[in-house]
Amino acid sequence: MSGIDDLPPLRDVIKRHDLSARKSLGQNFLLDLNLLTRIARAAGPLDGATVIEIGPGPGGLTRALLALGAAKVIAIERDERALGALQEIAAHYPGRLEIVCADATIYDPRPLLGGARAKIVANLPYNIATPLLIGWLSIEPWPPWYDTMVLMFQREVAERIVAREDDEAYGRLAVLANWRAETKLLFDISPAAFVPQPKVTSSVVRLVPRETPEPCDRRMLEQVAAAAFGQRRKMLRQSLKPLGVDPARLAAAAGVDPTRRAETIAVSGFVAMARELTDIRAIKSV
């Protein structure tokens, strides 16, 4: 038995269901139920909550979420080998675990939510983690169908999410993430906690969506950030040229010094430039 429920230890579950991790699916299984419980707790009170979990594998995090009182966990798993293990958990928690065998990069869970907001809590497969996050941050209209995300990434990716201006890791991902959410790196997890052991440290990040981010067109913001960070060592008056407008005038009109570099500009500066770009293009289209 485990320390959080009467189900078998995760190592036994993996052996019994022949769940050897597959590199092609980005799988690394976290087996320490204390760590898994810590991740689940980071999402805040779970009583009455609906939680979306991506890539549950043998179900360690699933069990932690249910043991902490989640009213419903919707587990989206692409690997059919894991379904047997998840069905055993579903039997232990009747009516509280819904298993969806699908590709999380294209599956839309909203029809299962009944209009309620959910939490997303997941040890994301490394190979789809960033695309999934960008998709969740790009949802329209905003605010989104979730109220909290607690996600595990490779440490390098986590640093890129929570970075601020003048940080080495600051870039396009940080601009999008911190425009639409409050982000925080919570804690690291050693490679030794996983089976098989990855070559890198993992980090758990919490993102809480801002109900009313600074107003601007997301696509324009992404274009400005892409241009600016595409030549991050150059001044904005040079790096913003791909936008097809006078870069110095664009930056100056937004209240940003065009001789500065992208890595020194706060998210609010990018938002201001995105709004200005929207106005310029609207005038041009008339």
UniProtKB/Swiss-Prot annotation:
- What SMART domains would the database entry show? rADc (SM00650)
Give yes or no: UniProt keyword Methyltransferase: yes
Q: Which cysteine pairs are covalently linked by disulfides here?
A: none
- GO molecular-function terms, A-Z: 16S rRNA (adenine(1518)-N(6)/adenine(1519)-N(6))-dimethyltransferase activity; RNA binding
Listed under GO cellular component are: cytosol
This protein's major location comes to cytoplasm
Organism superkingdom: Bacteria
**Alphabetical list of InterPro entries matching this protein:** KsgA/Erm, rRNA_Ade_diMease-like_C, rRNA_Ade_Mease_Trfase_CS, rRNA_Ade_methylase_Trfase_N, rRNA_adenine_dimethylase, SAM-dependent_MTases_sf
EC number, as in UniProt: 2.1.1.182
Sorted keywords for this record are: Cytoplasm, Methyltransferase, RNA-binding, rRNA processing, S-adenosyl-L-methionine, Transferase
Q: Which reaction equation describes what this protein catalyses?
A: adenosine(1518)/adenosine(1519) in 16S rRNA + 4 S-adenosyl-L-methionine = N(6)-dimethyladenosine(1518)/N(6)-dimethyladenosine(1519) in 16S rRNA + 4 S-adenosyl-L-homocysteine + 4 H(+)
Q: Where does S-adenosyl-L-methionine bind?
A: 28, 30, 55, 77, 103, 123
Record localization: Cytoplasm
The family classification in the record reads: Belongs to the class I-like SAM-binding methyltransferase superfamily. rRNA adenine N(6)-methyltransferase family. RsmA subfamily.
Q: Which HAMAP family match?
A: 16SrRNA_methyltr_A
Biological role: Specifically dimethylates two adjacent adenosines (A1518 and A1519) in the loop of a conserved hairpin near the 3'-end of 16S rRNA in the 30S particle. May play a critical role in biogenesis of 30S subunits.
This protein's name? Ribosomal RNA small subunit methyltransferase A
Q: Which organism is it from?
A: Rhodopseudomonas palustris (strain BisB18)
